[in-house]
Regions:
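Electropositive, glycine- and tryptophan-enriched low-complexity nucleic-acid-binding patches
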Residues: 1-33
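Glycine-rich, histidine-containing beta strand-loop boundary motifs that form or position
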Residues: 4-7, 42, 64-68
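Short, conserved catalytic/metal-binding motifs centered on acidic residues
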Residues: 38-47, 62, 145, 167-174, ...
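Short, conserved secondary-structure transition motifs
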Residues: 44-49, 67-76, 231
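Short, surface-exposed basic-aromatic patches at helix termini and helix-loop junctions that form
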Residues: 52-61
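An anionic, glycine-rich sequence signature occurring as long contiguous blocks
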Residues: 63-175, 258-270
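Short amphipathic alpha-helical "interface-anchor" segments enriched in bulky aromatics
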Residues: 154-207
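A short, flexible helix-boundary coil/loop motif
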Residues: 203-270
Length: 270
């Protein structure tokens, strides 16, 4: 996880801040993961020329939410009825009441070569909050994103873009590991606190990815604290070795033992 602390009056679409966080996030990846295809997803705050150009310069794949301005509205309304394809959910199943269309006629002059605009149309579900969003005469709501991915399967591209909402899970996890309240009065001290929170979240993510399975691999920090970190244990020495003895009756003691075994089995450098 990477992040920077910004003043309260900072804009949501400040490209330089996005570029800085991007560089930090790429450096946080293991070297082996920095090669090949890397996809960067962002909401419409990332739809700035400077940020998208930086993604293009680095050779990264991108999927960025796009604001629906007047020209985009016209392009959406110009879409033919047979140009819409049923959308899919994250499991590849058809999603009722949702369709996808590529706005190939939208003028994207000024954006990097190969930039495409893809639109999602859906019927709001009954409990949806009413917002001042663009709708057509049938009440459909629309979302648009731009991408440089060449995959002709726009349904898969749209589902992949929508999956970026999992960042909300990381934000929630960060709040549970210290980000909910910045404890200091000074900006620099709170910036250091943010770095510690990012380290904590990074440890949680890699622990879940490499050492845990099942429910624990997707559990919230509070659950991990209770089931694993609160496990009663005792350090003993035997044969010049330090041994951690866990409470045998603790329901998740076996999961913790397995996590240690997986951790010790990892190569020295990943």
């Amino acid at each position: 996880m990477s992040g920077i602390l910004r003043p309260g009056n900072a804009g949501s679409n400040t490209a330089q801040d996005h570029v800085e966080v991007l560089a930090m996030a790429l450096l946080a990846l293991p070297k082996a993961a920095r090669t090949g295809s890397i996809l960067v997803r962002a909401d419409s705050a990332g739809a700035t020329h400077a940020f998208v150009e930086e993604l293009h310069r680095r050779g990264l794949e991108s999927s960025i939410g796009f604001p629906i301005e007047a020209d985009v509205k016209q392009a959406i309304l110009a879409a033919p009825a047979d140009g819409w394809t049923p959308a899919a959910d994250q499991h590849g199943h058809q999603r009722p009441g949702a369709w996808v269309c590529e706005l190939s006629w939208l003028d994207l002059t000024g954006w990097p070569p190969g930039t495409r605009a893809i639109c999602r149309r859906e019927r709001p579900h009954p409990g949806a909050r009413k917002k001042m969003t663009f709708t057509d005469q049938h009440g459909h709501r629309f979302q648009v994103f731009i991408t440089n991915q060449a995959d002709p399967d726009i349904v898969a591209l749209e589902a992949r873009h929508r999956a970026h909402a999992r960042v909300e899970d990381r934000i929630r996890g960060a709040k549970a590991t210290g980000l909910r309240n910045l404890p200091c009065y000074g900006f620099a001290a709170n910036d250091a606190w943010l770095t510690l929170v990012a380290c904590a979240q990074t440890l949680v993510c890699w622990t879940q990815a490499l050492c845990l399975s099942g429910e624990l691999a997707i559990a919230e920090p509070a659950t991990l604290r209770y089931r694993l970190l609160h496990t009663a244990g005792r350090l003993v020495r035997h044969g010049r070795q330090v041994i951690l003895r866990l409470q045998r009756t603790w329901p998740w003691a076996g999961d913790l033992v397995t996590a240690f075994q997986r951790l010790r089995a990892l190569p020295a450098r990943c």
